[in-house]
Amino acid sequence: MYEWNEMVQLMISWIEDNLASTPTLLNMSEDLGYSPYYCTKKFHALTGMTLRNYIWMRRISRAALELRDSNARILDIAVKYQFSSQEAFTRAFVKAFHMTPAAYRRAPRPIPLAIRAEVFSPYHYHLRERIVMSEVEVKAVEVKIERIPAHKFIGTWDIASKNYGDFWRNGHNCDEISGTLDSMSHLSLPGQLGQTAGWFYQDGQKGYLYGIMVAADYDGEIPTGMECRDIPESDYLVFFHPPFDYLRTNGQVMKMVEHKAWNFDPTELGFEWNEGTLYDYQRHYPEGYGYAVLRPVKTMEESSDDIGQGSSGVSIVGDNETTA
């Protein structure tokens, strides 16, 4: 029943808000109005983890990000996330990531951070609300031009997957891949959103990719099971919908944007598609950015001068700036 999905999602939000405090199961169950027994039982059923292990992994992962991004003392970070001592924190960190906090701070490397669990989706929301798609309010899809500089793409390519759902159903571990990429978020190509999905073409067949865009001169570690490929500079047509309510309108927004992207004629703007060696990218950050599909293009000789001046009423986005 979707009611339990929603309740467990509320539990997850409650945990996220209290990672740096000392709440108890009783505190949470009282706040949410369910018994401790049902909280633990339903949480495990929907996430595949015990509450205790989930909280432990989320705390150690949040602490890892603070080690990477702040100058706070290791002891202070340990205490903040409810470890009894720096030694206890070190033991936990080694157990989770096979290296000490001090070693990680000196040389951050890709590690499998535990990501926030999500069990209440737009599907469950619409079961609850019984909203028909015609009642959903969405905005017009914008078309913009953006130049992305040469970069590297680190991730996973799967020719057997056609979309996001296919990708995770085809044996890729969402928690492991997303958590590892999250640990590399500080390396994201400036102006990009971090974890990026998209499509590639191989022998006339379309596959799906998932990873992160990093600087062209990146020479650091490549996570096990992932590849690193060089991507040249290119202009992209960006089919964009501004921020929206993920639970309420995600399906309709994605459908509209993708319909526009896959059916658009770039010659109207003096372009042609350039997907032979480049990839289509997908940006999905509903509340903070919105949703966009980016398709690489190259200018046509006969209209290159006009395009360079930003004709045809299409917005020109500067080098490496997102369209948010």
Where would I find each of the regions flagged by the language model?
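A solvent-exposed interaction/effector surface
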Residues: 61, 87, 95-99, 109-324
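A short, basic/aromatic helix-end/turn motif that makes direct DNA contacts
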Residues: 80-84, 94
